[in-house]
Amino acid sequence: MAKKRIVIKLSGSAFGGDDGKVLREYAAFLSGISGSWQPVVVAGGGRVARQYIANARSSGADETTLDEIGIGVSRLNARLLICALGAKAHPYPPATLKEVRHAVDGGLVVIAGGLHPGQSTNGTAALIAEKVGAAQFLNATDVDGVYDRDPNKHSDARMLRKIGLGELRKMLAREDSVAGGYDLMDLVALKVIERSRIRTRILRADVNVLKKAVRGTAAGTELVLPDS
């Protein structure tokens, strides 16, 4: 019987360590679940991408160019994780949805970066989840889940165990859609999740938290889809 596919958008913070320890932990986690799942990972750009984008923006680069810089960094991060996984991983990051679809047919762990300018890696991950028929989409971020307000600005912010897709869409509509500015999710991702009814969680990018989510234990914030 074919393994179920799970798409994990992995925050760029996983790739910023100096000694590679965190990266190896993620590689061990992905290798460990690959007996029962086929993981497809989308690497974020993280701090390095934001720094490069800020530098290029100060030099007058347009938004499309800034997006392309972010995509380039995310694909380098993907290559780092591929190196850590070795023979368990597809040997290079797919550059298009069609390439992703062909890559998963090989049965290995597939690691991608960004694909298209104007689209966050969250949107990319949702499109990939749709394309490969993923049973689950885990959006692993720098926070524990979705809060009722910005936890970085409000110490009394409350994390939500569940949030309706419509409510999250309203929250995101207030955010800027500029290169390097996406955090929890983007509107493209929500549209894809809704139309294909993809089971989705937003949670912290932490190996132990991801293990809980894969086992079916409550972790982070569950995205509640509207009735069909």
From Swiss-Prot:
Residues that hold UMP according to the record: G45, D67, L115, H116, P117, G118, Q119, S120, T121
GO cellular component: cytoplasm
InterPro entries according to UniProt: AceGlu_kinase-like_sf, Asp/Glu/Uridylate_kinase, Uridylate_kinase, Uridylate_kinase_arch/spir
The organism's place on the tree of life at top rank: Archaea
UniProt family annotation: Belongs to the UMP kinase family.
Pathway it works in: Pyrimidine metabolism; CTP biosynthesis via de novo pathway; UDP from UMP (UMPK route): step 1/1
HAMAP family per the UniProt record, alphabetical: PyrH_A
Compartments it resides in: Cytoplasm
Catalytic activity: UMP + ATP = UDP + ADP
Free-text activity regulation comment from the record: Inhibited by UTP.
Residues given in the record as ATP binding sites: K9, L10, S11, G12, S13, G46, R50, T141, Y147, D150
Gene3D superfamilies membership: Acetylglutamate kinase-like
Reported function: Catalyzes the reversible phosphorylation of UMP to UDP.
Entry keywords, A to Z: ATP-binding, Cytoplasm, Kinase, Nucleotide-binding, Pyrimidine biosynthesis, Transferase
UniProt EC number: 2.7.4.22
Organism: Cenarchaeum symbiosum (strain A)
Subunit structure: Homohexamer.
Enzyme class: transferase
Record's protein name: Uridylate kinase
GO molecular function: ATP binding; UMP kinase activity
